[in-house]
Amino acid sequence: MGKIIGIDLGTTNSCVYVMEGKDPKCVTNPEGGRTTPSIVAFTKERLVGEIAKRQAVTNPERTIFAIKRLMGRRYDAPEVKHWLEHCPYKIVEGQGGDAYVEVEGKKYSPAEISAIILGKLKKDAEAYLGEPVTEAVITVPAYFNDAQRQATKDAGRIAGLEVKRIINEPTAASLAYGFDKKANEKIAVFDLGGGTFDISILEVGDNVVEVRATNGDTFLGGEDFDHRVISYLVDEFKKENGIDLSQDRMALQRLKEAGEKAKKELSTAMETEVNLPFITADASGPKHMMVKITRGKLESLVDDLVKRTVEPCRKALADAGLKASDIDEVVLVGGMTRMPLVSKTVQEFFGKEPNRSVNPDEVVAMGAAIQGGILAGDVKDVLLLDVTPLSLGIETLGGVFTKLIERNTTIPTRKSQVFTTAADNQPSVSIHVLQGERPMANDNMTLGRFELTGLPPAARGIPQIEVTFDIDANGIVNVSAKDTGTGKEQSIRITASSGLSEADIQKLIKDAESHAEDDKKKQALIEIRNQADTLVYTTEKSLAELGEKIDGVTRGEIEAKLNNVKETLKGEDADAIKRATDDLSQASHKLAEKLYQQKAEEGGQPGGPQAGAAGGQPGAKAGGDDDVVDADYTEVK
């Protein structure tokens, strides 16, 4: 069995580690670098890494960088539209509405471009080890959703790698940090890389790494800081020369290179100068750029970006049930944490000096290699407990999002719950799988849908539909539904290539807080409607069964109150519906007594489950778990 390599597939740079005995070692590339630029260029041949980066200025439209930002995203996502304004290569709508890149008329999915980078890393590892490499552990941002994780796994498969495990980047970093540490510590891993930001709260020590909570922003990173510098340089040049460089792709590529360099220099220097001769030309001749940037100016340009990291930190601590003072160490990961303003912000929030004992560019790959060693059996007695970043569940009666698995649940995990039907003789139920934090289904993100068909004729509320969610150690979701009466079962593996955009993810959680009161009212209204609907159904059924056995006065009184409930259900006034329902409930007590007497005389017993969901959707309660059988389903993009 060959080595399992650990890969940090980064937005800006990627890194590979491998276990040699009990020690993780960095795999250097043929150019001598410990990290490889995540860049692919198309010329007469395909270039990857440093060689692709070097020719980017003269080949901007065919040089693809930061492809990770498009992984699992739809073309019409706000982040993709924003990215379109800043990148020189062409982004187009691909299969199923996904964001693809186009080079010389050919479309490439983000997974394909990522696979080219992974292929280069695989080749470098084989050259370093002197043996074939077929297995890998690949890291992803903790806040990557199911589709983005699946796309990453697909990229590995395209590159000829069996992805043994998808591991969260902050978790990998903590694994490397906590490797061989005996003392128990509560740590925060603050990971600000080239394209994404993650914060994870963990407990490490005595060979156990347990994630308590995670949060983040999958569209915040060094690329955004670079864009602020580029925009500043473009504005300064326009003020001085009256020429707008924002539409000049070659000039923008030079500015990107210079802006990134200036940003890095200002982490150690107080001032730097961007000097770009022959940046453009007009009728009067060639133009040169010479702009001085101070550290203070840079910090004023990116201050709001740095502040965006604070709220996820606050949420992660709250989810973990901890205060900032409870954290023993704050570990900095990702190149952007070298920026003084970032480390200062971290120190102010957590009230302690950040821990700089790990290499922020390599620690994630190191942790991935350690995880590879655990899977291969080379690293003993290390237990890693990770979590799922967002809640998962299904849509139930009235458009309510019923959670089966809460966010920050330790994975792998499996959860089942029993639901029922909403209509008499309902032949099928539609299972609408969702991910998010809002109470209402349409405020969350659809992962997929599938049908459980062939239900035998039965009154509403009688069928028992057991829905099971299964999340594996990679964070990838499987859902099944089983009719416990007939044993019929169908399932879906959530494999949609398009995923949640960062705006969607943030909307899910931020809206959940800012609209908490509104959500509460909506949910209360749905519950009251469900109660009223159930009471109307059972009352009408009882009236029909009793027939002539009920006197006209009682029947008239009940029917009047029944019609009143139906009228209030046409509106949105929860109080009015509740009052009408309470009136009907009191009036129908007599009816229930008569029905009970009738059943007793016939030797039968009243009862049966209450009604559940509407429109072919499931309705409500709990249950066990079973094996899964594949079935056809509609993939939602």
Swiss-Prot record:
Give the source's domain of life in one word: Bacteria
- CDD domains attached here? ASKHA_NBD_HSP70_DnaK-like (cd10234)
- Summarize induction of expression: By stress conditions e.g. heat shock.
Q: Which residues carry this modification: Phosphothreonine?
A: 196
Q: Where is the composition biased (Gly residues)?
A: 604-622
Q: Which NCBIfam families match?
A: PRK00290.1 (NF001413), PRK05183.1 (NF003520), prok_dnaK (TIGR02350)
Q: What is this protein called?
A: Chaperone protein DnaK
UniProt source species? Solidesulfovibrio magneticus (strain ATCC 700980 / DSM 13731 / RS-1)
